[in-house]
């Protein structure tokens, strides 16, 4: 009789088995791991790399007005050694310096050369204006075998002033130049340090020599230092070059009595440009905005791990080789085919599984990683995407990479390590500063990506919850949540009914009466099953108590009649 009642109860339950609709999002078999603020290695459906590692081993110059200086050093364009004759005036927005390039012909150096190099790299080229200096009582044609053209010569933009005769008196002279242009003028002059005192006397006469230069913002005096030095290019003497930027309407004055290398023309900067030191080959078939010694970085990513000294419109250099930016939700991978998966879910988790990851394949027109529905009813099973919530998430996530780029990209300039002995401390400070900036930006990059990843995962979870709440508010008492992202519907819900739930047009009043009746039947079955469990447990407990009571009574009777004895030993 009891068996018959149980069978009838189960049959009643099966007869009123509810249709079902589930919510979830697409999952992939192999997701991508990202880091967030709170957790490392979270697997997401979609992610994109933010660190560029691909280098183009060429200087991409398409669309650029490029000048390749070859054997000419950039500073040489201002003073004019023979190797720079074709670059005394030029216009460019990309200036290429080569390792073989040399700034000078007669041995010497530039004062504060790296600052001047930075100015010229950004100059956009240079144009010249004659300073109008004339000289009497001295020779202006000094030349040297170190600066050969067809024969001995000198710097094209400089005048080597000598006494009229060997050992002759060099007169005290003063020359001035006023900048009448609207832009600053670059003025360069030199001081000659003879290889010996005798050579200095032969070239400039006897006595101490002094050169004084001044303007409204500049004042400095120079005394030559004759003496033997190692020969370079056959010369034991040296010429040191000095420079200043002369403001518009300002005047520079030179006062000297020998050992003076006089400027012939002033230089003016043409505009803006990038300058790069590289031996990479020029390529007019590719475009670039970011350059380094090894070539070109072409990337829309916010970070790069190629060269810390890249210049131009470049991604920020970071130490990390990879920083993945999440562009999809957390992934719940599935390890079986559709048929196996469906069977597994029916057996282990119900038909559709939990909220996350129940859909094993994408739908046409749907971007992987977003939201959708799956239902079961008398007409079978079906799957559909929810484009509104999908688009809402996409709209908020789209542009994450661009926002990172806006936060990180800027124009970079190259500061080299070619410092002279006096500038070593400055060079050390620059190197330390560069290393510190790399450390800071490497940390910042990791932090920025982690923040965006946290936001993406929270956002996609939020959209999933919104969709779930939308369905729950529609169904109300007509359905029951099963805790796995699904709703058991207490009335017959055909495909049109399921579509109305998805479209947010479901009318719960229309199905309320049927749903209440079916809910009562299901609840009754559950209630009967609950009472049966209570009775079974009560019966088991009572049986155990009765057995123990009988055993105790029998033991008491046996002990009383002497048929049983209990001995306690100590």
From Swiss-Prot:
Residues 19-533 are extracellular. It comes from the Viruses. The record marks 349-350 as: Cleavage. GO terms for cellular component: host cell plasma membrane; membrane; viral envelope; virion membrane. A lipid is attached at residues 566, 569 (S-palmitoyl cysteine). Its main location: virion. GO terms for molecular function: host cell surface receptor binding. It is a single-pass type I membrane protein. Binds to sialic acid-containing receptors on the cell surface, bringing about the attachment of the virus particle to the cell. This attachment induces virion internalization of about two third of the virus particles through clathrin-dependent endocytosis and about one third through a clathrin- and caveolin-independent pathway. Plays a major role in the determination of host range restriction and virulence. Class I viral fusion protein. Belongs to the influenza viruses hemagglutinin family. This is Hemagglutinin. It comes from Influenza A virus (strain A/Equine/Sao Paulo/1/1976 H7N7).
């Amino acid at each position: 009789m009891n068996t018959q009642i149980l069978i009838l109860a189960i049959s009643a339950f099966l007869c009123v088995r509810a249709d079902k609709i589930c919510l979830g999002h697409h999952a992939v078999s192999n997701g991508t791991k990202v880091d967030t603020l709170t957790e490392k290695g979270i697997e997401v459906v979609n992610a994109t790399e933010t660190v560029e590692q691909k280098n183009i081993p060429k200087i991409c110059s398409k669309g650029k007005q490029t000048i390749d200086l070859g054997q000419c050093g950039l500073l040489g364009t201002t003073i004019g050694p023979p190797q720079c004759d074709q670059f005394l005036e030029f216009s460019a927005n990309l200036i290429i310096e080569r390792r073989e390039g040399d700034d000078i012909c007669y041995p010497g150096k530039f004062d504060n050369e790296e600052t001047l190099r930075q100015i010229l790299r950004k100059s956009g080229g240079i144009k010249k204006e004659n300073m109008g200096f004339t000289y009497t009582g001295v020779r202006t044609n000094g030349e040297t075998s170190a600066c050969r053209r067809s024969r001995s010569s000198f710097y094209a933009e400089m005048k080597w002033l000598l006494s009229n005769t060997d050992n002759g008196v060099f007169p005290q002279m003063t020359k001035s130049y006023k900048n009448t242009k609207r832009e600053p003028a670059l003025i360069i002059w030199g001081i000659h340090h003879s290889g010996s005192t005798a050579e200095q006397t032969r070239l400039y006469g006897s006595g101490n020599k002094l050169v004084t230069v001044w303007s409204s913002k500049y004042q400095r005096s120079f005394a030559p230092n004759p003496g033997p030095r190692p020969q370079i290019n056959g010369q034991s003497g040296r010429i040191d070059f000095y420079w200043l930027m002369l403001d518009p309407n300002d005047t520079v004055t030179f006062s000297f009595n020998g050992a003076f290398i006089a400027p012939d023309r002033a230089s003016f900067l043409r505009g803006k440009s990038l300058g790069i030191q590289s031996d990479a080959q020029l390529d007019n078939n590719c475009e670039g905005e970011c350059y380094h010694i090894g070539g070109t970085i072409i990337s829309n990513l916010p970070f790069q791990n190629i060269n810390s000294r890249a210049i131009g419109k470049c991604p920020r250099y970071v130490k990390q080789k990879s920083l993945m930016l999440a562009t999809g939700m957390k992934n719940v991978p599935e390890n079986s085919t559709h048929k196996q998966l469906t069977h597994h879910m029916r057996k282990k988790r119900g038909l559709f599984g939990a909220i996350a990851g129940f859909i094993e394949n994408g739908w046409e027109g749907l971007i992987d990683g977003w939201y959708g529905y799956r239902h079961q009813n008398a007409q079978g099973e079906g799957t559909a995407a929810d484009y509104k919530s999908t688009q809402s998430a996409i709209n908020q996530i789209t542009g994450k990479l661009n926002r990172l780029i806006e936060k990180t990209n800027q124009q970079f300039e190259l500061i080299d390590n070619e410092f002279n002995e006096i500038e070593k401390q400055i060079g050390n400070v620059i190197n330390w500063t560069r290393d510190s900036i790399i450390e800071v930006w490497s940390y910042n990059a990791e932090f920025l990506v982690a923040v965006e990843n946290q936001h993406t995962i929270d956002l996609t979870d939020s959209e999933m919850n919104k969709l779930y709440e939308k369905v729950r508010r529609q169904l109300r008492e007509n359905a029951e949540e099963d805790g796995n992202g699904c709703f058991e519907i207490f009335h017959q819900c055909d495909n049109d009914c399921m579509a109305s739930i998805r479209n947010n047009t479901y009318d719960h009043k229309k199905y309320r009466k049927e749903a209440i009746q079916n809910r009562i039947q299901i609840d009754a079955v559950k209630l009967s099953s609950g009472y049966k469990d209570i009775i079974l447990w009560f019966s088991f407990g009572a049986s155990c108590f009765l057995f123990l009571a009988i055993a105790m009574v029998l033991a008491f009777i046996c002990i009383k009649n002497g048929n049983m004895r209990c001995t306690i030993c100590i």
